[in-house]
Curated annotation (Swiss-Prot):
Involved in chemotaxis. Part of a chemotaxis signal transduction system that modulates chemotaxis in response to various stimuli. Catalyzes the demethylation of specific methylglutamate residues introduced into the chemoreceptors (methyl-accepting chemotaxis proteins or MCP) by CheR. Also mediates the irreversible deamidation of specific glutamine residues to glutamic acid. It comes from the Bacteria. It catalyses: [protein]-L-glutamate 5-O-methyl ester + H2O = L-glutamyl-[protein] + methanol + H(+); L-glutaminyl-[protein] + H2O = L-glutamyl-[protein] + NH4(+). This is Protein-glutamate methylesterase/protein-glutamine glutaminase 1. The gene is cheB1. Residues 8-123 form the Response regulatory domain. It comes from Myxococcus xanthus (strain DK1622). The modification 4-aspartylphosphate is found at residue 59.
Amino acid sequence: MSSKGVISVLVIDDSAHNRRTLSTMLESEPDVRVVDRAADGEEGLKKVVDLKPDVVTLDLEMPKLGGYTFLRLLMRTAPTPVIVISSYSHRSDVFKALELGAFDFIAKPQHPTFEAMEALRVELLEKVRAARHVRPGYRHAAPGARAMAVAGEPPLVVAVGASTGGPPAVQRVLEGLAVEPTPCVLVCQHMPPQFTRAFADRLDRIGPFSVTEARDGDLVQPGHVYIAPGGRHMVVAERGSRLELQTPPPTPVDKYAPCVDRLFVSMAQVLGAKALGVVLTGMGADGAEGARAVHRAGGEVWAQSEETSVVFGMPGEAIATGAVKRVIPLGDIGPALAALARRRR
């Protein structure tokens, strides 16, 4: 357990090299201390119980006790925030881990250049600092009935922005939206390239909507969910009387790609008073400027409530702008959107 503001971390990884590398990164700052390391889930679970660390970093592919089983047992016996360290080759595995209660994940760089490893160090420390303040727990989401896509314009186009804690939150929102007439949902989730495709594929298999990673030129369709591609933006544009999606590359000054602000601003410009943006859990302030733009255009912005957010950074910053019309618990966002879609039919 931490003392005097120092965050205690347990590193679990079956690779001795990875354990050393992560430990060095974590202890490069004075407010973080690695209390111990473990080579597998069984050893890790015992050390969590004994040492009570503030945060755990976890490799999912381990001998004896794998990552999924470790998470299930941990959340039952000693709930602790977990950051999954994932390779690109196992990118689809992280979403199951998030459902089982993991706080967030970090993608190992495909090419461990100095710049890539420094970016990993910065991201790791940022997420460890955020994780110590959350209340971990098992998140279960049951599949819903699949909404039917129909031709024509959707009665409602919803832009959803999320970061840390977002994948399970997005899934929860979609489960409340299997309604007629079917809306269209545009999701901007901070996530690396390739992981967004895996995220879309997983939601498509288990959720109530047809879900794809957005491609440049996609027409906005009712009953469809589009996930912004990692490493690019997703914006709404007009194509004659229809709406289309564009996926421009980021500029050198962009902090996030995809960026919630960029999506919300495009919604405000194209849809005006019909624009609707929802800011879900996440670190930072992405979405706040976009919320202002939607509000100025006469549209609506909703934000996830603090008590249901894994991290209240993004919703809190959006609320602070004065542009948010409704602050809603996560479980009520989907039904509220469904009710709005019915009114707009």
